[in-house]
A protein has these predicted regions:
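N-terminal hydrophobic/helix-forming segments and targeting peptides
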Residues: 1-2
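Glycine-rich phosphate- or other oxyanion-binding loops that anchor nucleotides, phosphorylated ligands
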Residues: 5-236
Length: 236
């Protein structure tokens, strides 16, 4: 855990619930920023970094790319492969995070590898398979890690990634699953209901997504607890 008065780690997420998990109880030195729209996220991240930071971590959920990864798998990335090229994560920090998780009850669901990053949602199984191949075997994909990596590099700060898989590689997301996501990272129920009313056949897929999201949320909450308690959530 950070010493009193140390600069915070900035956790970069896309959604409000991820930010809430990342921030924890708000007393151990993690400040979370979030937004679903890239420019809003970059603005929030810049403001947080201007206040001072000891490191940047991309923290939240992800889509699965590895064909064997179940919902709730935790990915501690070695590098991010995205629109700005491949960026290496801080090796010492990432190794400490992985070691803490591998020494915990979350060991069986923890993996190391590459995290892919994209600028637009990747919801189809075929698209996920194509990205897995083109990225050289990336395990998971999100829409924030490349932004977090670039911001950390620009400030000379250590960077790490901890992501939990929601939708596995073989599962396509129904349109309703994304309908309620607002630009600021919050969610609204009414657009989801409208989409279901338009096409009720999406209900089964949406229920599967809800179950997958529950597994990811549980894993992410557990990872936050383990990493915070061990001190591995913070760079040295």
């Amino acid at each position: 855990m950070q010493s009193r008065g140390a600069l915070p780690v900035i956790a970069v997420t896309g959604m409000a619930f991820e930010a809430s998990i990342a921030a924890g109880k708000g007393r151990d030195g993690v400040e979370a920023v979030y937004a679903a729209r890239a420019d809003l996220l970059e603005r929030a991240l810049t403001a947080a970094l201007d206040r001072g930071a000891s490191g940047v971590i991309s923290f939240g959920t992800a889509g699965g790319l590895g064909p064997d990864l179940e919902p709730g798998t935790l990915v501690i990335a070695e590098a991010v492969d995205g629109p700005f090229g491949r960026v290496e994560c801080d090796p010492a920090w990432s190794e400490r995070m992985a070691a803490a998780l591998l020494a915990s009850p979350l060991a069986a669901q923890t993996r190391r590898g590459v995290e892919a990053a994209v600028a637009a949602p990747l919801t189809g199984a075929a698209d996920k398979a194509a990205l897995h191949q083109s990225s050289g075997g990336a395990l998971a994909v999100d829409m924030e890690s490349h932004l977090a990596a670039a911001a950390a590099a620009a400030r000379g700060l250590p960077f790490a990634v901890c992501r939990a898989v929601v939708d596995p590689a073989w599962r396509s997301l129904p349109k309703a699953a994304m309908a309620g996501l607002r630009d600021d990272g919050s969610t609204a129920v009414l657009p989801i209901l409208r989409e279901l009313a338009r096409d009720p056949r999406q209900l089964g897929g949406l229920l599967r997504v809800a179950a997958d999201a529950g597994a990811a949320r549980k894993a992410l909450t557990g990872a936050r607890r383990v990493l915070g308690a061990s001190g591995a959530l913070f760079p040295r």
